[in-house]
Amino acid sequence: VATEKDYQNLINSFESQTWLIKLSPWGMRLYLTLLEEEKADKAILLRDIHTLFEAANYSSQSPQAKIFKPTKGKLSKYEGYKEKLFNDAYEGTMDEEFLKLVKSLDRHYYHVAIMELLEANIPLLQRFTTSEDKIIAQRATSLIEAIKHPKIYPISQ
């Protein structure tokens, strides 16, 4: 059974400045998968998912995000990325073409991907709102509310 330190090490690796941008959507997928494991500490996972969601939400409202202008090419790349990220049958193989796409994807889309991935997984999260463990139920409810009604940050340029 994983300890809280194990979970903290996992989220710390996802939050490192160098990797947060590129790993967070895949880290989020890992967290969602772990939520379905019987022995996983769901209270810790839900807390950490909420942390990553808030980071993505904040970053999506940054001055750089506000001036971001999507193009057909950028949207096409994001759709290709999303196709694998949202595909439960995708086994994780990253061929040369997909690695090239990941490296060229604008960082704005990594934040958007986290938010969209969580929104798509609200049905999974709702299963935990009725948990007998009050902490799990409260964290799941709080996370769903945050996803449905993202906080608006007063960010100035």
Regions found by a protein language model. Give the residues of each.
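Core register positions within helices of long alpha-helical scaffolds
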Residues: 9, 47-52, 124, 139-146
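Acidic, serine/threonine- and proline-enriched intrinsically disordered linkers and terminal tails
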Residues: 54-125
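Glycine-rich, aromatic-bearing surface loops/beta-hairpins
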Residues: 142-157
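Buried hydrophobic core positions in alpha-solenoid tandem helical repeats
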Residues: 31-32, 124-126
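Alpha-helical solenoid scaffolds in large eukaryotic transport, assembly, and signaling factors
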Residues: 1-37, 41-69, 109-113
